């Protein structure tokens, strides 16, 4: 756990949250189970709030997940954010024996999971009958206090419609040129159902590289866990990063999840970027994997 400590111990007070991915395997590479890891970190580093980017709704029965989240909310004294997505990584579904239905079905399951979880947190007892998930006279005591915000991480049209209807927060990756299309789709989905867009807290994940030698900067990045998927990288200078963050702040993004390629970049971000965006809470880097979802 030295890696986590070396990252989290160096963060100033402006960094307020820690985010963990939720995967079971990528071939034979080492992957820690996300709920267990997050629970450990929440106990070991109690000054942060914690969430997942994002939990695959398929991997845990939603009624049990509601109970797990409520328990963690009490143990952490209100420091948990429930990040959910439809699930996408077929390899781990197949390897671990989970059914892998169509994308549309997984998004429908996501919507039902959120509805069921909210029922568990607010009704006592709770009953819910959906196409995919059902409960009958289920108790979730003690219920979470304070209420747990639900974040949905997605750029898919169907899942954005679910986000507009049911989520408290939304996450997708920056920079603005990547973020813009799902942002505009989410705004349109909110308009269509009459929900004020401003009710949803907007968050953005940023991949950042600020090498001392600017000629070493690569504007795109392919994570070893996501072959074939290319991420846009912010950099190479602090001014470049600040400019992109400001563009996202201008459209209402309130919270950032930062993925730094190395500790040198993290230190430069802390010293040269974070003070210039002090009006926005800038969370710590996502540790290890990035998320990608419905």
Model region roles, listed by residue range:
Residues 203-238:
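Active-site pocket-lining/capping segments in soluble small-molecule metabolic enzymes
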Residues 8-13, 38-47, 69, 73-79, ...:
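Acidic (Asp/Glu)-rich catalytic clusters
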Residues 1-11, 65-68, 152-165, 218-220, ...:
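Short, acidic/polar
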Residues 61-166, 180-199, 288:
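Internal, glycine-rich beta/alpha segment that forms the wall or movable "lid"
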Residues 31-52, 109-116, 120, 192, ...:
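Alpha-helix-loop-beta-strand connector modules within alpha/beta enzyme cores
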Residues 30-37, 175-190, 263-268:
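Active-site-adjacent beta->alpha loops and helix N-cap segments on the catalytic face
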Residues 18-20, 49-53, 80-84, 150-153, ...:
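Hydrophobic faces of well-ordered beta-strands that scaffold small-molecule active sites
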Residues 1-48, 148, 259-263, 287-289, ...:
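N-terminal beta1-alpha1-beta2 module of alpha/beta enzyme domains
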């Amino acid at each position: 756990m030295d890696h986590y400590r070396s990252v989290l111990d160096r963060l100033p007070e402006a960094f307020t949250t820690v985010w963990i991915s939720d995967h079971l395997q990528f071939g034979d590479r080492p992957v820690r189970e996300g709920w267990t890891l997050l629970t450990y970190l929440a106990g070991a580093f109690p000054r942060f709030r914690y969430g997942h980017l994002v939990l695959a709704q398929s991997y845990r029965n939603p009624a049990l997940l509601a109970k797990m989240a409520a328990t963690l909310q009490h143990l952490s004294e209100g420091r948990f954010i429930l990040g959910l997505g439809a699930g996408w990584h077929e390899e781990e579904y197949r390897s671990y024996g989970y059914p892998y239905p169509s994308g549309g079905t997984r998004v429908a399951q996501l919507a039902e999971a959120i509805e069921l979880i909210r029922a568990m947190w607010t009704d006592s007892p709770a009953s819910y009958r959906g196409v995919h998930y059902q409960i009958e006279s289920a108790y979730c005591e003690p219920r979470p206090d304070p209420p747990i915000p639900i974040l949905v991480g997605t750029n898919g049209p169907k899942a954005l419609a679910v986000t507009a209807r049911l989520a408290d927060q939304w996450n997708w990756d920056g920079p603005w040129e990547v973020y813009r299309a799902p942002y505009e789709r989410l705004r349109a989905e909110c308009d269509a159902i009459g929900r004020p867009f401003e009710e949803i807290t907007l968050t953005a994940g940023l991949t950042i590289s600020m090498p001392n030698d600017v000629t070493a900067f690569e504007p795109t990045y392919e994570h070893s866990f996501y072959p074939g998927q290319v991420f846009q990288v912010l950099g190479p200078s602090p001014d470049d990063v600040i400019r992109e963050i400001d563009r996202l702040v201008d459209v209402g993004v309130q919270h950032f999840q930062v993925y730094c390629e190395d500790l040198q970049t993290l230190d430069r971000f802390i010293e040269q970027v974070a003070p210039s965006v002090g009006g926005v809470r800038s969370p710590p880097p996502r540790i290890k994997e990035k998320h990608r979802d419905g």
